[in-house]
Amino acid sequence: MAHTPATADVAPIPPTPEQQQFVDWLRAVAPYIHAFRDKTFVIGFGGELVKAGMLGALVNDIALLHAMGMHIVLVHGSRPQVEEQLALRHVQTQFVDGIRVTDNAALESAKEASGELRLDIEATFSQALPNTPMAGARISVVSGNFVTARPVGIVNGVDFQHTGLVRKIDAESIQHSLSNRKIVLLSPLGFSPTGQAFNLSMEDVATNTATALKADKLIFITEVPGIMDRVGKLQQELSMESAIERLREGRLSADTAYYLQHIVKAMRGGVRRAHLIPFALDGSILLELFLHDGVGTMVSHTDLEYLREATLDDVGGIVQLIEPLEADGTLVPRERRLLERDIANFSVIEHDGIIFGCAALYPYPKEGVGEMACLTVAPDTQGTGDGERLLKHVEARARAVGLKRLFVLTTRTEHWFLKRGFVHATVDDLPEDRRKLYNWQRRSMVLMKKL
């Protein structure tokens, strides 16, 4: 005799606070993981990070990004390591406008420092990352002569000798390696077509590589914590126009201005986003990529967050946003095909390509009434005013099509709507077509607002 489970008698089991925290975290980062998969990130970091003992933590984080399907190009710097090599050789070098004049002794020191650093980085990736979340992961790192360089030459009477600039990046070979699931590692050295070696800057190599690859992100992990505003507060987001204006003002520190100049150059060359984040904060690259506000400064071509009408491309993001609220009964479950059918009714808030809020307007023109449905804001952005913005946007859409009233059906957010001008109504106040669809088992409250 077949056993029929008594599912109707099974009470839901509430998760522990730790379990709920984990579920909430995973739901919050899932849209980012989906959006960043198969995207190309060029990540530049200075030798100062290695000297500070942060290489192991960074490699662990990079391995995690790689495992999530992101294409990674790493560019390391080596200035403090070059200084150590010069000290061993009892050699002093000259800096002009922050650029080292690389004589023969300095070039040998740069080669030695870059070679040792490259081997240290490769060895760290090859250790199977013991005692980390990526323990046992097999990660291939490739290096090569991907960078063609040219001399800086003589500038204002100063011969920079073996100091160089990037002439060309072998983007095709790098892309081939990335497509084969390799991490590409570049050093701050380049070679001319005749085989002459040049000492380069990490920032120049990273910027030109990101431009050549049309990378989705250029990320500098540096001693600079980010870009500060005029009162010393971190600017989490900047448009490229604002970044250029900050450079024109001339009030930034020399190091900050240096990085920002390279960021602007990269974005003018086709890079979509750029980040400046501190290496002193353990896990800063993960926090920057997977937290809404990040921990450094992100620069984009336009303002990162904007409210717009939804398209079919947004259906997946809306589904991810509303699924948790459907699961706990806050929202009525919606089939994906119905979302696709009704997508023109939806408005969304997008931030860096991720959907963080949505709401829909269903008009009933005969009665001059509209229903606002599916008002949802991501948990990590609640309290920032996004719900208010969506409400005002839906009200504006309703007025634009001649509606006089707006109603919502809710079981849990009554007071939020009452504070914003809605009043209690009855099922009889609903348009006839909507009244026929009212769910008497759910018994949602009807709230109405005059527009």
Curated annotation (Swiss-Prot):
Q: Which family does it belong to?
A: Belongs to the acetyltransferase family. ArgA subfamily.
> What EC number(s) has UniProt assigned to this enzyme?
2.3.1.1
Q: What is its main location?
A: cytoplasm
The record's misc note reads:
In bacteria which possess the bifunctional enzyme ornithine acetyltransferase/N-acetylglutamate synthase (ArgJ), ArgA fulfills an anaplerotic role.
Superkingdom assignment? Bacteria
Q: Where does this polypeptide localize?
A: Cytoplasm
Q: In which pathway does it act?
A: Amino-acid biosynthesis; L-arginine biosynthesis; N(2)-acetyl-L-ornithine from L-glutamate: step 1/4
Q: GO biological process: any one?
A: L-arginine biosynthetic process
Pfam family, any one: Acetyltransf_1
The record's annotation in PROSITE patterns points to: GNAT
Q: Where does this protein have coiled-coil stretches?
A: none
User: Which InterPro entries has this protein been placed in?
Assistant: AceGlu_kinase-like_sf (IPR036393), Acyl_CoA_acyltransferase (IPR016181), Asp/Glu/Uridylate_kinase (IPR001048), GNAT_dom (IPR000182), NAGS_kin (IPR033719), NH2A_AcTrfase (IPR010167)
- According to its UniProt record, this protein's enzyme class is transferase
- Tell me the organism: Ralstonia nicotianae (strain ATCC BAA-1114 / GMI1000)
**Can you list the GO cellular component terms from the UniProt entry?**
cytoplasm
According to UniProt, the name of this protein is Amino-acid acetyltransferase
Keyword field? Acyltransferase, Amino-acid biosynthesis, Arginine biosynthesis, Cytoplasm, Transferase
Residue ranges constituting the N-acetyltransferase domain according to the UniProt record:
305-451
Q: Which GO terms describe its molecular function?
A: L-glutamate N-acetyltransferase activity
> Can you state which reaction this protein catalyses?
L-glutamate + acetyl-CoA = N-acetyl-L-glutamate + CoA + H(+)
